[in-house]
Amino acid sequence: MKRATYFNCLAALSIGLLSNAVLAGDAIGPTVKQAINYNAIGMFVVFVLLTLGITYWAANRTKTTADFYTAGGGITGAQNGLAIAGDYMSAATLLGLTAMMYTQGVDAYIYMIAFFVGWPMILFLMAERLRNLGRFTFADITSYRLNQGKVRTMAAISSLVVVCFYLVAQMVGAGQLIKLLFGLDYGIALVIVGALMMVYVTFGGMVATTWVQIIKAGMLLFGGTLVMVLAMSQFGFSFEELTTRAIGVHKLGVKLLNPGNLLADPVTAISLGLGLMFGLAGLPHILMRFFTVTNAKEARKSVLYASGIVAYFFNVVALLGLCAVVIVGQNPNFFEEGQIGGKIIGGGNMVAMHLAKAVGGDMLLGFLSAVAFATILAVVSGLALAGASAISHDLYSRVIKQGTASEISELRVSRFATIGLGIIAVVLGLLFEKMNVAFMVALAFGVAASANFPVLIMSMYWKGLTTRGAIAGGYLGLVSAVTLVVLSKSVWVSVLGYAEPIFPYTQPALFSMPLAFLAIILVSKLDRSKAAELERAAFADQFVRAQTGVGAATAAAH
């Protein structure tokens, strides 16, 4: 029982590593406010000034809805790959996974693989069709041959659920992370992040968001690589020397490099893996990036570049964790009261930062802290833009106005929606400050895997899909994912205070995603209406466009 409980804590941590929401407080160590880091603040101010300058430049280029939502479709594959990686890799990827590698060894690397396996599926099955069939949001694809109003409404609702929970989780994690790294108060941190997010998206749209993500990805790759190179130099750049010394000093010994210590609950492990893999393919802010490139070829390049960057960075993080075992784990200066093996100063998530200080001094520590703050802004900007697009493009323009809205009015709604989402995120972030928000991230990925992904993949590949089937599957996936998370320990026990959870597992995808697929297939098969016949017949035209790109949106001229 104890072992299973420990696994659940680490599983909750793992799903949060894709966001800044879960800082491993329960699984690795508490978040402790540090002294004000002036080096980090100074470097972050430079980053903010640079990105505000880019936003000013982007605002002059953002004149149409295509500019606002997709940067006019003129981003190259390499640029978009960097931006996708910047949108995907968060500060907690660096801090949380390094800490997990430091404590659990090779099992943490297995979790990294779980985060990665969704990318090949997107590359081979989705990237080309996403670009050829969509324009601004993934609802353009799911509603391509189906009832626009009903399907777009369902897609927008599920998108907003994912975005809102993910955004609030990001904001709570941002406040805690900034308190940890910069020594700033939680409320001040939230206001700074919320204000900058609203400025980037409201004025700069996708152009500004893209370049913020590109710069952040470059900073994260440079900072992580620099720390890794400096750390590995202490082992003569020998992986054998590193592992030998790490095994010699770590409490797990040889088991540090043996897998299987976290498999006490295989159902949760499988459900977590499914949620991470298929949830990635249903995240609105990730899917939206495929509409920013010029054509399907560049969309495939985007995924290839993003996959390579993410894979490279995960390997960097793995090396950082192992290096920290020796460099940080044997230095009493990084432990409370100088007791090696005791509590790490600042909490377990400070392992990467302590390693940076050990190999590069205060300047490198300040730079890496500034990078962590920059990652927060990049991720929340992408989320805010995805949420605003669902409101303005899917609900306002296509459902309420039924395609008659002017570009000016749609842009106005987009910007007001961004401001509204920013205010809501800050307020909810303040309200949820003391709460473990792992369930929010679980819910975001659960809904993405259970509501968005099944409808999206079936709309692209199955001729038999009908509006009724899509609606049934989408809403059942949404409701079942939310219900199972509420009935799990994360909410039923930790939040509502009941003694035992009704649903025994913390991750819903293994149960809610098959329900969604089953509903889609059964309801579509049973649908004998005239509309269903027309929708099935329209698949041939959709297939031609998906394969050839004929009729797909083109890049705007600037």
Say what each PLM segment does.
Residues K2-A12, N20-H558:
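Membrane-embedded helix-loop-helix hairpins and adjacent transmembrane boundary segments
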